[in-house]
Each structure stands twice: as C-alpha cells, then as structure tokens.
A protein has these predicted regions:
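Generic low-complexity segments that are intrinsically disordered, proline-rich and/or Lys/Arg-biased
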Residues: 9, 38, 92, 116, ...
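Negatively charged, low-complexity tracts enriched in Asp/Glu with abundant Ser/Thr
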Residues: 1-30, 70-113
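Intrinsically disordered, low-complexity regulatory segments enriched in Ser/Thr/Pro
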Residues: 1-3, 41-87, 127-164
Length: 164
C-alpha cells in the first residue's frame, strides 16, 4: 500500500474505514477485497436500480467489480475525514455503517500484523483474511477467520480501545 501523505507507514485502519464507508453508501454486501500494487480491487453484490438500500422492490442484485487506485483511496480518506469533522462535534461511532465499522476494526487488526499485502472476503458479516508477511526466513501467507460474532464484539470494544 502506498504511504498516504500524513499517514503512518501502514494505515489499513483508516484506508479500509474509508472504503467501508463507500460500500455503505453504495449498499454493497458480500464483498471481496484484494490489495494490488496501485490500490485495491473490490468485488461485491449491489442492488441496481435502487436508492442504495436492500429492499425487495428496489431493484435487482448485480455483482460489481471496482478498482480503487491510490488517488481514489486518498480522496476517500479526505472525504471521510471531512464528513466526520463536519459540525465540529466528535464523530458518532453509532451512526457509521456496518462496513465502515467492520473494515475499520479489521484494518486496526491488520496494522498490528504488519503485512506486506492483504486479501479478504466477507459473507453474511463473517470475514476470512489472508495476509502476506515477510520475515527473516522468507515470506508466507497467514489466514485468519472472524465470525460475525467476533466482528460485532470487536466493533463493540472499538471505542474503548481507541481511548486506551
């Protein structure tokens, strides 16, 4: 991942949070995200011909594949920060959408692992994550699975973790 101006060396927490907010706005679900040399490739299910929410009369389901280049990610991060800072009040974690929250807490966990690149998919709120890490003995992939209950528990603990 490119180092974004003003960001620490790796800031998957903020990058993934920004992508998650975008997904919430688009009404996507069951997503797959792959890190590429120049950004991210994302695939997910969306409702075409609707207002962005999942409803039976709101359209039909389509699989979309999106490419987010480094410049797109930087713009998402700037827009997300501007949205959160609008009005000057402390952002309300409760108003954030599911993907903004879940991607943020996954990003925080990923930052702690210090991977070289990432891949994950989500289905029904559960995530499978594959990280590529380089050690003195060489590179290797690591898998981790987070159930929907795991993610919800991590989301519930996130505000306290940020204060620590």
């Amino acid at each position: 991942m490119r180092i974004y101006e003003g960001s620490p060396r790796q800031d998957f927490e903020e990058v993934l949070r920004s992508i998650g907010a975008f997904l919430d706005q688009r009404g996507m679900r069951d997503v797959l995200l792959v890190e590429a040399p120049d950004g991210f490739i994302l695939q997910g299910l969306a409702v075409e011909g609707s207002t962005g929410t999942w409803s039976e009369d709101g359209g039909h389901q389509v699989k979309e594949t999106l490419t987010f280049l480094d410049d797109d990610i930087a713009r998402f991060m700037e827009e997300a920060i501007a949205r959160r800072n609008a009005g000057g009040a402390v952002p309300d974690w409760g108003k954030a959408g599911y993907y903004e929250k879940s991607f943020r807490i996954l990003g925080r966990w990923i930052d702690e692992q210090k991977p070289r690149d990432i891949f994950f998919f989500e289905q029904d709120g559960a995530f499978v994550v594959r990280l590529y890490r380089v050690a003195p003995t060489g590179g290797h992939h690591t898998l981790a699975e987070f159930t929907k209950d795991d993610i919800e528990a991590m989301i519930a603990q996130a505000p306290q973790a940020r204060q620590a």
